[in-house]
Every structure is written in C-alpha cells, then in structure tokens.
Regions:
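Oxyanion-binding and handling regions
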Residues: 2-38, 49-52, 106-235
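Short, conserved active-site loops that position catalytic residues or coordinate cofactors/metal ions
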Residues: 35, 56-58, 79
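A short glycine/serine-rich beta->alpha loop
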Residues: 41-46, 79-83, 183-186
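N-terminal phosphate-binding loop and adjacent alpha-helix
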Residues: 43-65
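Generic structural marker for isolated residues within well-ordered, non-membrane alpha-helices
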Residues: 58, 94, 111
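Phosphate/pyrophosphate-binding loops at sites that engage ATP/ADP/AMP, CoA/4′-phosphopantetheine
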Residues: 58-73, 162-167
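DPxDG-like acidic metal-binding loop motif
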Residues: 74-105
C-alpha cells in the first residue's frame, strides 16, 4: 500500500526582509536573493569549486542589493538528498550566516523542489542522479501538496508507481541518464529561485541554525575503491 505523507506546515517570516536561498545539491552553484519583491539569481555549473565560489557570489548579491547578512529575514537551503559534499557546503555556509543574527532557516527537500516544476497533478515522479548507478526519487501529488512515497535511492529501472496511481509525468536529471526511470519525464532541475518560492508557500518548517538538518537516504555515504570496482564489475 502506498504511503501518504503530508508536507509540513509552517508560516514563513512575513516581515518582508530579504531572503537568501542556497542550492548546492548538484555540481551547480545556485544562489537566489529575494529583496523588495525582486529575485536576483546566480546559477552556474561550477563543478568542484562550490566551496571557493559560494561566499564570493553571496557577497556579490548582497552588495548589489545594498544589504548584509544581518538584514536577512530567512535563509533557505537545499536539504537533500543530493551530492553529500555539496549539501554540507551549502548547509554550513547557511548556518554560518544565520547563527550570529539568529536568522531562521528553512530546509527544502531537493525532490520536492524538482516536483514543484511540474503542473499540478495527482501523481508525478521526481528523480535525480544519485551516482553509482542509482537515483534518488519520490512520488508526489502536486495538486494537494502531498508526498505519496518515502524518499528513496535505488536503480531507476526498479521504480514502480504507487499502488492505484497513474503517473502523469516525471522531472529531474535522472531522466537524462542512460539508465533512466521507466516513465515519461523531463530532465529539468530547480534553481535556488524555485526553493525561495516553495519556502514562501509556508509548507516547510523554519528552525534555528543549530537544529538545521540535512536529508540523507543512503545508509552509507561513501564506498571504498574496492566496493566501487565491485559494483562496476556487476552485469
């Protein structure tokens, strides 16, 4: 039987202060700043240079808007699942900016952000590249803002629709893989601006920096070189 999980409800700060969003869950560095009803976005594939570029790009956005970290009303961050190192970089920077000023933080699951790109539907699949021949995925009812399954990692070919549901579409960079999910889908991915929009929906909990958490779905984050070689040798 399918598991129905209601997305959390929480009111986003409404004092109209600037909001920063950070997504480092892939090789892209995506940063968005909402200030005075305008969103400025940096979104670029920087590979392994996220740690080098994230603070300079945030400072550039602050300078262009004429603000500092002390002016932020909230910081939104990509919670996972995604690239382990990238997620840690983004969360650490967000916590570092939030802690001195007690700025609330909102974590948005990456698959939720991907699913939000699709038109409202009763059953859609969000799936992203998890490396090592696997994908992260979850099913969503985007009409009613309900997640229909757990966040899962596994082989794309093994993904099955929730019981009694007919999928209407899929989203995420897993659909660009050679071994992609066995459903129709597009390989689009969210930017930090999409995380801002979800945070503004009020459906995700705000917390202080000390209690901000990441979402992992792998029991073991890293494989040894021997284990990776063994996986590659499998038919």
């Amino acid at each position: 039987m399918a598991t129905h999980i209601l997305l959390k409800n929480n009111i986003m700060p409404t004092d109209n202060r600037p909001t920063l969003a950070i997504d480092t869950s892939t090789s892209f560095l995506s940063i968005a700043l909402e200030h005075q009803s305008e969103i400025c976005l940096f979104h670029e594939n920087v590979g392994t240079k996220q740690s080098e570029q994230i603070l300079p790009q945030i400072e550039r956005l602050f300078k262009e808007a004429g603000i500092t970290a002390a002016d932020l009303g909230c910081i939104v961050y990509a919670q996972g699942p995604g690239a382990f190192t990238g997620l840690r970089i983004g969360a650490a920077v967000a916590q570092g900016l939030a802690t001195p000023f007690d700025t609330p933080m909102i974590g948005i699951p990456c698959l939720d952000a991907a699913a939000s790109l699709l038109p409202p539907s009763s059953c859609v699949l969000a799936a992203t590249d998890a490396r090592m021949g696997e994908v992260f995925y979850a099913w969503f009812d985007t009409q009613n803002h309900v997640r229909l399954s757990d966040y899962t990692v596994g082989k794309a070919s093994a993904i099955a629709a929730p019981e009694g549901q007919t999928p209407s579409g899929g989203i995420g960079n897993a659909f660009a893989l050679a071994d992609k999910p066995p459903f129709d889908g597009q390989a689009d991915m969210p930017t930090a601006a999409d995380y801002l929009k979800l945070a503004r929906s009020g459906r995700y909990l705000a917390t202080d920096a000390a209690h901000a958490e990441l979402l992992y779905v792998r029991n073991k984050i890293a494989l040894t070189a021997q284990e990776q070689a063994q996986q590659k040798a499998k038919p």
